[in-house]
Amino acid sequence: MKKKLLSLLLALCFVMALVPMTAFAEGTSVDNWDGTADTSWYTDHKTDTEYHFTTAEQLAGLAQLVNDKTASVSFEGKTIYLDNDLDLSGTQWTPIGNGGNFGRYFAGTFNGQHHKIMNLNHHYTGDELVRNGLFGVVSDGGTLKNLLVIDADIDSNDGSLIAGILADWVNGGTVENCYTSGKIENNVGSKFVGGLIGQCTWSTQVKGCGSDATVISTESDEDHVDTVGGLIGQWENGQLVDYRLLVWRFCFLQ
């Protein structure tokens, strides 16, 4: 009984904790995406260690830089700040970091400063292995924090294996004070699907996060099994990882 009361109390605390985070973003300006990508904030300032985003085009530019097949930029040691809300309506989003290996991943720090990224739309039917959420691959100490991804609509009907609204795959990274809502749906088997993150591996830490996203898996083939979670689809490498390195605390789902 005591454990049950404690769990309910913790859930209430963290739900309430998100109220000021959401309220903080209310009333701020919103930039609407025109479908293009702007990389000038980086190409003209490559030695900078901090960048401030005010447009959705800059965010799309980040995806373009990280996903470049010949000259991918991981942003390790650099911090990106989101200075206002972004609306991604009307154009399909290309995740930041993609591919089936660690060749193209985000390793910097993305600080949303409690702002919202709204109406992320991604209906993918290609053959990339990781390509669904706001971030495709976060690795090597990459950090996502203080960010809300609101009213996302993700429909994964391919063989991409991993799908999450905030991030598909986090390998040895940190996700802190992040929240997602909307819908993520998978209609193909053998996937890891989560309302927040599709898959966490190695020394990943998830702290103070929540989601009330709808997570749907409709695969009916008994030979294909999905691993589905309200927050995280799968946490892998149980036999290889020292679980003292794994942190998952102060999280909730609705």
Predicted regions and their residues:
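Broad structural signal for hydrophobic residues in well-ordered alpha-helices, predominantly aliphatic
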Residues: F14-V15, Q234
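C-terminal segment of classical bacterial N-terminal signal peptides
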Residues: V15-F24
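Positively charged n-region of N-terminal signal peptides that target proteins for export
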Residues: M1-L5, L9-L10
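Surface-exposed repetitive/solenoidal architectures
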Residues: F24-Q254
